[in-house]
From Swiss-Prot:
Heme 1 (or BL or b562) is low-potential and absorbs at about 562 nm, and heme 2 (or BH or b566) is high-potential and absorbs at about 566 nm. Keywords: Electron transport, Heme, Iron, Membrane, Metal-binding, Mitochondrion, Mitochondrion inner membrane, Respiratory chain, Transmembrane, Transmembrane helix, Transport, Ubiquinone. It comes from Ursus spelaeus (Cave bear). SUPFAM superfamilies: a domain/subunit of cytochrome bc1 complex (Ubiquinol-cytochrome c reductase) (SSF81648), Transmembrane di-heme cytochromes (SSF81342). The lineage of its organism: Eukaryota, Metazoa, Chordata, Craniata, Vertebrata. Belongs to the cytochrome b family. It is a multi-pass membrane protein. Its main location: mitochondrion. The cytochrome bc1 complex contains 11 subunits: 3 respiratory subunits (MT-CYB, CYC1 and UQCRFS1), 2 core proteins (UQCRC1 and UQCRC2) and 6 low-molecular weight proteins (UQCRH/QCR6, UQCRB/QCR7, UQCRQ/QCR8, UQCR10/QCR9, UQCR11/QCR10 and a cleavage product of UQCRFS1). This cytochrome bc1 complex then forms a dimer. A ubiquinone binds at residue 201. The chain crosses the membrane at residues 33-53, 77-98, 113-133, 178-198, 226-246, 288-308, 320-340, 347-367. PROSITE patterns: CYTB_CTER, CYTB_NTER. GO terms for molecular function: metal ion binding; ubiquinol-cytochrome-c reductase activity. GO terms for cellular component: mitochondrial inner membrane; respiratory chain complex III. This is Cytochrome b.
Length: 379
């Protein structure tokens, strides 16, 4: 009798995706982050669901409802901090996952890669709206500043901003709609993740060498299920350590002050995972130029595959490209640091140089390095 997992319509899909899936035998720990993102997403949906049971999306009670969750709800503080720090873990895994894709040439699976970019943008939108919900000072002013960027769009900008706000300033209507979107978007992310996997399984996974591995595949279960469980355990350990020992490490103290439209915080800044893009936005003097640079700092990923000049797929055997890749990583860390600093000397010039470098490396230097490496192979 044929095994039910191979015949049952629903079990067959799960079997082909997570059990009998032919997987390259040499994929490293860098391939763990996809499953870790799945773990993070499920965790965020579950903790978010329990938070939504106690949260009120009204400007007068939003802040006190968060206080109520932390003080009165049974283990509410754990749920709240797991959700807040879970977002940080989510973005750490996202950056690692995208970095892996860039390093090993996974962007050449264009459908999977493009769905991934849409996923990244959706997750960023969700995280931004979630940051507004506690209705602290940084929530309010962050929402005001970031939504106001749309006013840089010629002709329709101001109308667009007021349409998003639901009035003439960030107020009750804004908070209510942000809560509604923040609740629905994770389920859209879940659906997009399924499409992302669907396209990935059309081609099969890439591997560190970048060489087709059809001749050397092993079943996903038990080899990679065990590996993924280990990754999930380490992630859970890191998250638990963060939540239980220093839950406010990655947060902003200003968000413990209730939102006050009459008092602007000295330094308005978003969560740490947006600081690199925020730094690029800030260090372009022109408003529209800054907004375009901000958008392009993410959308640059969409044209990476067009700039691939090397005859080899990954960077495993390309020392020049490796140097440039790690320079880009260092540059991103520099931008993240600068984004959290005040706009004054010497941070301005460092930010401008780091922003220029951020675009120069993938658009100019990496394609040139690819051509040089191709010619070096002829020697």
């Amino acid at each position: 009798m044929t095994n039910i997992r191979k015949t049952h319509p629903l079990a067959k899909i799960i079997n082909n995706s997570f059990i009998d899936l032919p997987t390259p035998s040499n994929i490293s720990a860098w391939w763990n982050f996809g499953s870790l993102l799945g773990v993070c997403l499920i965790l965020q949906i579950l903790t978010g669901l329990f938070l939504a049971m106690h949260y009120t999306s009204d400007t007068t009670t939003a802040f006190s409802s968060i206080t109520h969750i932390c003080r009165d709800v049974h283990y509410g503080w754990v749920i709240r901090y797991m959700h807040a720090n879970g977002a940080s873990m989510f973005f750490i895994c996202l950056f690692m996952h995208v970095g892996r894709g860039l390093y090993y040439g996974s962007y050449l699976f264009s459908e999977t890669w493009n769905i991934g970019i849409i996923l990244l943008l959706t997750v960023m939108a969700t995280a931004f709206m979630g940051y507004v919900l506690p209705w602290g000072q940084m929530s309010f002013w962050g929402a005001t500043v970031i939504t106001n960027l749309l006013s840089a769009i010629p002709y329709i900008g101001t109308d667009l901003v007021e349409w998003i706000w639901g009035g003439f300033s960030v107020d009750k209507a804004t908070l209510t709609r942000f809560f509604a979107f923040h609740f629905i978007l994770p389920f859209i992310i879940l659906a997009l993740a399924a499409v992302h996997l669907l396209f990935l399984h059309e081609t099969g996974s890439n591997n560190p060498s970048g060489i087709p591995s059809d001749s050397d595949k092993i079943p996903f279960h038990p080899y990679y299920t065990i590996k993924d469980i280990l990754g999930a355990l380490l992630l859970t350990l890191a998250l638990a350590a963060l939540v239980l020992f220093s839950p406010d490490l990655l947060g902003d103290p200003d968000n413990y002050t209730p939102a006050n439209p009459l008092s602007t915080p000295p330094h308005i800044k978003p969560e740490w995972y947006f600081l690199f893009a925020y730094a690029i936005l800030r260090f372009i003097p022109n408003k529209l130029g800054g907004v375009l640079a901000l958008i392009f700092s993410i959308l640059i990923l969409a044209i990476i595959s067009l700039l691939h000049t090397s005859k080899q797929r990954g960077m495993m055997f390309r020392p020049l490209s490796q140097c440039l890749f790690w320079l880009l990583v260092a540059d991103l860390l520099t931008l993240t640091w600068i984004g959290g600093q005040p706009v004054e000397h010497p941070f301005i010039i460092i930010g401008q140089l780091a922003s220029i470098l951020y675009f120069t490396i993938p658009l100019v230097l990496m394609p040139i390095a690819g051509i040089i490496e191709n010619n070096l192979l002829k020697w």
